[in-house]
Amino acid sequence: MNVENQTPNVDHQEIAKFEAIASRWWDLEGEFKPLHRINPLRLGYISQRAEGLFGKKVLDVGCGGGILAESMAREGADVTGLDMGAEPLQVARLHALESGVAVNYVQETVEAHAQAHPGLYDVVTCMEMLEHVPDPQSVVQACAKLVKPGGHVFFSTINRNAKAWMMAVIGAEYVLKMVPRGTHDIKKFIRPAELMHWVDSTPLREKHITGLHYNPLTDHFKLGPNVDVNYMLHTRHDK
């Protein structure tokens, strides 16, 4: 595992994918439309499970162009956004400036950030990022190191099975064209049991898991108990 960040836990091809379309991050009808659509659900889940965000120090790992980071800052959180993509961070900084929202954006790996700032944050979020790095377990361990005792860490990713491949790759990329082709690689998807196993190797403990569902007939997203495709996991640092 890459906890000490001796070799940066970075997939440059993955970064290039998002840098190529970063200028359209805040286009509500563009490639990131699904992220804008699900953001209220993600924000609501995080805020509820963390017992509110106001006044809390929050880190958004893999923040991209800042959709979730900005929304948490609007809730009154002191937010730092972390990403390795220069172009998405430039977009995020500009949008925050235009929106009048204070977010501190940093270009750094989560492992390096954990080395420099252990136990700094009340809440850490890592949304749709684990499936885009070579060593996702290293990210989980770094997130655990960054949060205070009693603090909250949230992960979201995609399950690895035939249904997830049909929905997240074939359906979303080829049929519905919700995201660009090549966005996802089923080999990098993560089963909930795998993620929980990584969590159990840290001081984090699972508190709740929920699925994120899309109905193409109604064009509607909702949270629910089925974790066959997209899911979010709430964990808490054992005091």
UniProtKB/Swiss-Prot annotation:
Pfam families, alphabetized: Methyltransf_23
InterPro entries per the UniProt record, alphabetical: SAM-dependent_MTases_sf, UbiG_MeTrfase
Matches recorded under Gene3D superfamilies: Vaccinia Virus protein VP39
GO molecular function (one): 2-polyprenyl-6-hydroxyphenol methylase activity
Pathway(s) the chain acts in: Cofactor biosynthesis; ubiquinone biosynthesis
Keywords in alphabetical order: Methyltransferase, S-adenosyl-L-methionine, Transferase, Ubiquinone biosynthesis
Documented EC number(s): 2.1.1.222, 2.1.1.64
Gene Ontology terms describing biological process: methylation
Residues where S-adenosyl-L-methionine binds: 42, 62, 83, 127
Catalytic activity reported: a 3-demethylubiquinol + S-adenosyl-L-methionine = a ubiquinol + S-adenosyl-L-homocysteine + H(+); a 3-(all-trans-polyprenyl)benzene-1,2-diol + S-adenosyl-L-methionine = a 2-methoxy-6-(all-trans-polyprenyl)phenol + S-adenosyl-L-homocysteine + H(+)
Family membership: Belongs to the methyltransferase superfamily. UbiG/COQ3 family.
Listed HAMAP family: UbiG (MF_00472)
Physiological role: O-methyltransferase that catalyzes the 2 O-methylation steps in the ubiquinone biosynthetic pathway.
Protein name, per record: Ubiquinone biosynthesis O-methyltransferase
Organism in which the protein naturally occurs: Pectobacterium carotovorum subsp. carotovorum (strain PC1)
Lineage: Bacteria, Pseudomonadati, Pseudomonadota, Gammaproteobacteria, Enterobacterales
